[in-house]
């Protein structure tokens, strides 16, 4: 059963009010019955009776789980499918991932819920567009068209929703005539579901942004249950996209914003509230949702869940970090499902038919999208595998949607002609993307320095979005690695300033600095991290040396915090082209074969530092 959208007045939410609402919500939540009940099924393949303990206002009691026939009369199931960080990954690769396959899985789930009187809710947690030619050549239009057909109920606005900037080829405004959010607003206007942004604040009004079809929250009807959905984005949003496209915006704290908006939704009649949060975490084991030992305990979405008053938010669809989550934190189910259209998350909310409130929940591991599966392990199998069987889900074979394929076809055809263009170069060994120093990261930095003719290049590991396979270089492969339309910038740093920039990055989490033209050795001394720099020929860089540095407009504007230790930046020049285009031109003129061993070995690192990031020098 599809969720049907329902118009509502969101109420006035000021930034000042969001910060002050926590105590009010905490007291109100005591009056919300039935929201603190939790049930986890320990093993879905060996169902057995479980004991459910219900905490109510005046007394606690325990009862045996109802029989299936009684459950059918008294409860219904709302299955929530959560996606995030599609990044334009609309297509399957070798029978894995893509929106046509997602539609096949969702159709099977909808059929299952229709048969038992429940419903399905499809929610996205942001970063829908940026990342592939299929999406970027039309500024995300193809993603919205496919999401409309899939029947999404809502999508959060993530940091990369701002990447396209104004409508047209430029990624940032050229002048006052350009709306820095033009492309985002156009995509929202095309959507048959709302874009949610409760904590993205217009500084001129101190209220959440109110662009056409962009709002803090929505209420939808799922099998007769009024479900509220609140959208929020990571506190790092403004430093994780183009600064020119977020001028005049602020990000309100996530937990107070969620609490305030969820309370308003309940006052407006929602009996279930879900958060769609472009904020994430990382877990690696999914057998037991209550076991958090494989999860990073201090991750943003876990801090948010623990800060929420009990019973205000029933569940969270998370994203941003590109990792899996299928866990319960502070009594709240949280799911997240990697990136690039690889998988989806799911939790089932068991809802009392009379009260409309959640009585229990089930959390499912991230589900990979597969056309075929291994008959023994049921894991995804290659299409070419002779023993693979068609995948099944909810007791039915999964069939990729021909309707979705037809929607994607024009964008796929347009991208194909661009992707196939050969460049004058070859990659000898597969190069993998990581958030540590890598051969691929060093190669991208080398390309950027060579293209700009600079002394040094500074890039960021977060800007590298795909592995680079062995074989001939094509524009499509280069584009997959560097999909952002960041402009090539040059600026001047002294040796002392560059040392400061590198030391700062090594002492923080997040995107790693990528360098070309110098090698940095860092060591702790007297409680400080001290960095020594050498030029590639071996000469030490002095504090007063002036270096011409190639970088991107994203980093020059403070992105990822890499260049923020130096302010103001000097001699900044826009070189008039996109970084990727400059690299492609240079490869075409100076092409050769690149080997991994030339770019990184244990003895030939560009960043040498004690331990792991973030480096701490105050430890004994």
Predicted regions and their residues:
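Serine residues within intrinsically disordered or low-complexity segments
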Residues: 4, 9, 22, 27-29, ...
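Bacterial N-terminal signal peptides
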Residues: 50-59
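Acidic, metal/ion-coordinating pockets
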Residues: 40, 62-377, 381, 435-447, ...
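Catalytic centers of hydrolytic enzymes
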Residues: 76-79, 88-89, 95, 103-105, ...
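Bacterial N-terminal signal peptides that target proteins for export
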Residues: 28-51
């Amino acid at each position: 059963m599809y969720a049907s959208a329902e118009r509502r007045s969101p109420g006035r939410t000021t930034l000042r009010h969001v910060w002050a609402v926590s105590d009010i919500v905490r007291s109100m939540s005591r009056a919300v019955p039935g929201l603190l009940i939790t049930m986890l099924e320990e093993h879905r393949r060996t169902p057995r009776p479980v004991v459910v303990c219900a905490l109510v206002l005046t007394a606690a009691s325990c009862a045996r789980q109802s029989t299936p026939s009684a459950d059918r009369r008294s409860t219904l199931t709302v299955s929530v499918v959560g996606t995030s960080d599609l990044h334009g990954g609309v297509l399957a690769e070798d029978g894995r991932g893509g929106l046509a396959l997602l539609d096949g899985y969702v159709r099977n789930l909808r059929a299952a819920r229709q048969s038992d009187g429940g419903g399905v809710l499809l929610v996205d947690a942001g970063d829908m567009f940026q990342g592939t030619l299929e999406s970027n050549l039309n500024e995300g239009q193809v993603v919205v068209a496919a999401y409309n057909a899939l029947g999404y109920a809502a999508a959060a606005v993530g940091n990369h929703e701002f990447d396209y900037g104004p409508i047209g080829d430029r990624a940032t405004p050229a002048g006052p005539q350009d709306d820095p959010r033009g492309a985002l607003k156009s995509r929202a206007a095309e959507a048959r579901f709302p874009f949610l942004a409760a904590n993205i604040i217009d500084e001129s009004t101190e209220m959440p942004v109110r662009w056409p079809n962009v709002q803090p929250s929505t209420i939808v009807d799922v099998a007769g249950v009024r479900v509220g959905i609140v959208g929020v984005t990571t506190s790092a949003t403004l430093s994780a996209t183009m600064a020119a496209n977020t001028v005049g915006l602020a990000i309100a704290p996530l937990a107070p914003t969620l609490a305030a908006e969820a309370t308003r939704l309940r006052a407006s009649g929602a009996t279930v509230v879900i958060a769609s949060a472009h904020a994430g975490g990382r877990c690696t084991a999914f057998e037991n949702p209550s076991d958090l030992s494989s999860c990073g305990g201090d991750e943003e979405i876990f801090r948010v869940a623990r800060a929420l008053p009990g019973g205000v938010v029933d569940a969270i669809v998370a994203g941003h970090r590109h990792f899996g989550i299928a866990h319960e934190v502070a009594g709240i189910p949280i799911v997240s499902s990697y990136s690039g259209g690889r998988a989806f998350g799911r939790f089932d909310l068991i809802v009392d038919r009379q009260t409309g409130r959640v009585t229990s929940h089930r959390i499912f591991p991230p589900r990979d999208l597969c056309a075929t599966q291994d008959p023994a392990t049921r894991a995804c199998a290659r299409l070419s595998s002779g023993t693979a069987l068609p995948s099944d889900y909810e007791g039915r074979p999964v069939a990729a949607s021909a309707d979705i394929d037809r929607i994607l076809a024009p964008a796929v055809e347009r991208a194909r002609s661009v992707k196939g263009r050969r460049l004058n170069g070859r990659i000898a060994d597969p190069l993998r993307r990581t958030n540590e120093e890598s051969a691929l990261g060093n190669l991208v930095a080398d390309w950027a320095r060579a293209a700009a003719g600079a002394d040094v290049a500074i890039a960021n590991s977060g800007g590298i979005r795909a592995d680079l396979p062995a074989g001939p270089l094509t524009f499509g492969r280069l584009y997959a690695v560097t999909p952002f339309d960041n402009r090539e910038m040059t600026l001047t740093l002294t040796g002392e300033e560059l040392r400061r920039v590198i030391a700062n990055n090594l002492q923080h989490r997040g995107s790693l600095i990528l360098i070309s033209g110098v090698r940095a050795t860092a060591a702790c001394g007297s409680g400080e991290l001290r960095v020594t720099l050498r030029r590639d020929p071996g000469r030490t860089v002095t504090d007063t040396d002036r270096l011409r540095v190639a970088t991107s407009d994203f980093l020059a504007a403070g992105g990822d915090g890499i260049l923020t230790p130096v302010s103001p930046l000097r001699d900044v020049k826009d070189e008039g082209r996109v970084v990727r285009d400059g690299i492609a031109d240079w490869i075409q003129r100076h092409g050769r074969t690149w080997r991994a061993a030339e770019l990184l070995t244990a003895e030939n690192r560009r960043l040498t530092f004690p331990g792991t990031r973030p480096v701490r020098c105050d430890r004994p």
